[in-house]
Amino acid sequence: LQSIPAGFFDGLTGADSFNKTFNGCTSLKTIPEKLFAKNVNATTMQSCFQNCTALQAVPAGLFGTTTKTKTLTSMFSDCSSLATIAADAFSGVNAASGTMMNIFLNCTSLKEVPSGLFKNNAKVTNYNYAFKGCTGLEKVGPEIFNCANGATSINGVFTDCTSLKEIGDNIFLNPEK
C-alpha cells in the first residue's frame, strides 16, 4: 500500500477508534487531506501511522471538526521519512482533554515544525516527548502549543533533537492569561 484513497473512511461516521490502523505499513508514502474529516465520533488514533517509514508528509486538514478525538499518542512516531507537516493538520481536534504524547517521536527526516501547529488544540493536556528523537529537526515556528486550558505535561518535548537551531517566540501560547 503506497497511498490511501481520498474518502477512504467517509462511510465510518460511527467509528470511535483508529488505533494502529496503518501501523507498520512501510510502503505507505501519502495520505489524503481530510482523511478523518467525517469521523466525528473518533476518540482515539493511537499509533495510527506508527512505523510508516516511507510516509513523507502529514496533509492539510487531516481532521474535520472532531470534538471527541482525545488520544493521538504515537500517531506518527517512527515515521523516518516524514519531512513536512501541514500547519493546519490538527486544527479540528478539540476534545475535552487529550494527549499528543510521542506524536512525532523519532521522525528523523522532519526539518521544521510549522508555526501554530497545535494552536487550535487548547484542550490538549499532554505533549510529553512530542518531538523526541527528531534528529533532523532544525526549526520550530512560533505559537506551536496552545496551553490555554492548562497543558500539564510537556516533558522532553525536544529531547534528542540534536540539529535544533531555532525556536520561535511564544511556542507555549496561552492567549487567556
Regions found by a protein language model. Name each.
Residues 1-177:
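Solvent-exposed loop and capping/linker segments of extracellular ligand-binding repeat ectodomains
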